[in-house]
């Protein structure tokens, strides 16, 4: 057998990405470009991501049509691309290989030893933290992430080292195709159930994910989460390192407190009987400290020293749309966050409470009617850390409305669940009126969601700019 045939050939012809501007697709495209492959793709509109890919040498078409495939030899799609898409149909008609995003990612991973970061929540931040620590430790990893890493200005980078760090997306089950050497599991919650169907299937999916690691690999698991603790009990014939706040975790955070939104803590490496004292993470949130512990477990496994770990955590620059401060006007801080699942929303608002001396005003745009419907009671109860909650219209993401799962249904449900100040808002003008009416210096406005709410958050400081003048003259 020719061993070279088991790796991605260096000459594939033009690789066409349908939806090249997507956060999952663009990272793979960027790494392929950096490896010298001929890359092209299409998206429905231009964006900073597509413009960056063009600067790196990709050909990008705005709009999707069959003619875009001229010269293409391979077509890469995400799970969102279905029959009926003109480029998908044209590829089928021409007999071109159609490759799912995860399959192409898996081929890239075969070129390196790999760390795959899985879990319902925290994947993107944890991937960034692993990359940050390994970068600081001289490992120089290649990284493919599901969010823009502030330190890189991109969701991908090509390193010269032997390791690759990737975000493993469980949404369509294809993360089980990734050939991970080290697999991280942050948590397991019901999400993407349109694919998994049952919680038992979801559990099996994560068991398959960690079971794919080789005998010399490592599973890094958060045993603060009951589902992950159960998963650990099912892992056989593979090494496991646990992390969390609980007393049994191999990598444990202790003495945690917050100063001006900065997490201060020590890390107990219990199997080594070592305490890494005086660690700081320049962002609030117990969930972010937990994510950092996963990165520390990997860094320690790869030989990083305690001082290097401490320095890397202190210099962590974060990820776009993960508790990102987009402005401060008149003493009012505006935060943009991707959180769109009740567990994520609760964690982000708890972090906001830790970071703010004033009140917390939450603004949420529900993402998909199906998610709101299936987790309705959880959504009604996840805003308890916010003093004021405003709910925007549901971002449908192509779905049809579901009875009982609307903006107004959620507001009414929150009030029934005991929230004192929940209301509906219509648009950006309504948001501005709400903030002017409710917010005071020292308060924090947290905009949450996976849809267009990010644009609202980023535009809000300019809309409130006169408040700075009022504060200065007052």
Swiss-Prot record:
One of its GO terms (biological process) is regulation of cell shape. One of its GO terms (molecular function) is UDP-N-acetylmuramate-L-alanine ligase activity. It catalyses: UDP-N-acetyl-alpha-D-muramate + L-alanine + ATP = UDP-N-acetyl-alpha-D-muramoyl-L-alanine + ADP + phosphate + H(+). Its EC number is 6.3.2.8. It is an enzyme of class 6 (ligase). It holds the Pfam family Mur_ligase. Its main location: cytoplasm. ATP binds at residues 119-125. It is found in: Cytoplasm. Pathway: Cell wall biogenesis; peptidoglycan biosynthesis. The keyword Metal-binding does not apply. One of its GO terms (cellular component) is cytoplasm. Keywords: ATP-binding, Cell cycle, Cell division, Cell shape, Cell wall biogenesis/degradation, Cytoplasm, Ligase, Nucleotide-binding, Peptidoglycan synthesis. Gene3D superfamilies: Mur ligase, C-terminal domain, Mur-like, catalytic domain, NAD(P)-binding Rossmann-like Domain. HAMAP family: MurC (MF_00046). PANTHER family: UDP-N-ACETYLMURAMATE--L-ALANINE LIGASE, UDP-N-ACETYLMURAMATE--L-ALANINE LIGASE-RELATED. NCBIfam families: murC. Belongs to the MurCDEF family. Cell wall formation. This is UDP-N-acetylmuramate--L-alanine ligase.
């Amino acid at each position: 057998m020719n061993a070279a045939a088991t790796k991605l050939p260096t000459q594939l012809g033009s690789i066409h990405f349908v939806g090249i501007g997507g956060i999952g697709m663009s990272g793979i495209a960027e790494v392929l470009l950096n490896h010298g492959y001929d890359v092209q793709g299409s998206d429905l509109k231009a964006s900073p991501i597509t413009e960056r890919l063009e600067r790196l040498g990709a050909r990008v078409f705005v709009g999707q049509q069959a003619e875009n495939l001229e010269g293409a030899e391979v077509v890469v799609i995400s799970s969102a691309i279905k029959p009926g898409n003109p480029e998908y149909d044209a590829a089928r008609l021409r007999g071109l290989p159609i490759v799912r995003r995860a399959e192409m990612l898996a081929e890239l991973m075969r070129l390196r030893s790999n760390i795959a970061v899985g879990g319902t929540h925290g994947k993107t931040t944890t991937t960034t933290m692993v990359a940050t620590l390994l970068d600081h430790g001289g490992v120089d990893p290649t990284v493919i992430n599901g969010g823009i890493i502030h330190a890189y200005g991109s969701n991908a980078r090509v390193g010269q080292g032997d390791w690759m760090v990737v975000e493993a997306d469980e949404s369509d089950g294809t993360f089980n195709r990734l050939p991970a050497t080290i697999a991280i599991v942050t948590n397991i919650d019901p999400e993407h159930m349109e694919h998994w169907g049952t919680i038992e299937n979801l559990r099996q999916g994560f068991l398959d994910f960690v079971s794919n690691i080789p005998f010399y690999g490592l599973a890094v698991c958060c045993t603060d989460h009951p589902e992950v603790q159960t998963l650990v009990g099912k892992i056989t014939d593979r090494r496991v390192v646990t992390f969390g706040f609980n007393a049994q975790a191999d990598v444990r955070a202790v003495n945690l407190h917050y100063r001006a939104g900065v997490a201060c803590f020590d890390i107990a490496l219990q199997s080594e009987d070592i305490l890494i004292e005086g660690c700081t993470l320049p962002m609030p949130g117990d969930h972010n400290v937990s994510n950092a512990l996963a990165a520390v477990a990997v860094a320690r496994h790869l030989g990083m020293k305690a001082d290097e770990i401490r320095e890397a955590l202190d210099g962590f620059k974060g990820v776009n749309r993960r508790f990102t401060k987009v402005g401060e006007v008149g003493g009012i801080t505006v935060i943009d966050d991707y959180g769109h699942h009740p567990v994520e929303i609760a964690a982000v608002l708890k972090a906001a409470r830790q970071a703010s001396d004033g009140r917390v005003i939450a603004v949420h745009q529900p993402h998909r009617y199906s998610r709101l419907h299936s987790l309705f009671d959880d959504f009604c109860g996840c805003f308890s850390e916010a003093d004021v909650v405003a709910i925007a219209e549901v971002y449908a993401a192509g779905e049809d409305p579901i009875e009982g799962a609307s903006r107004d249904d959620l507001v009414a449900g929150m009030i029934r669940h005991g929230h004192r100040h929940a209301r509906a808002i219509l648009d950006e003008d309504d948001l501005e009126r709400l903030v002017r009416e409710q917010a005071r210096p020292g308060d924090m406005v947290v905009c949450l969601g996976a849809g267009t709410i990010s644009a609202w958050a980023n535009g809000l400081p300019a809309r409130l700019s006169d408040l700075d003048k009022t504060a200065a003259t007052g």
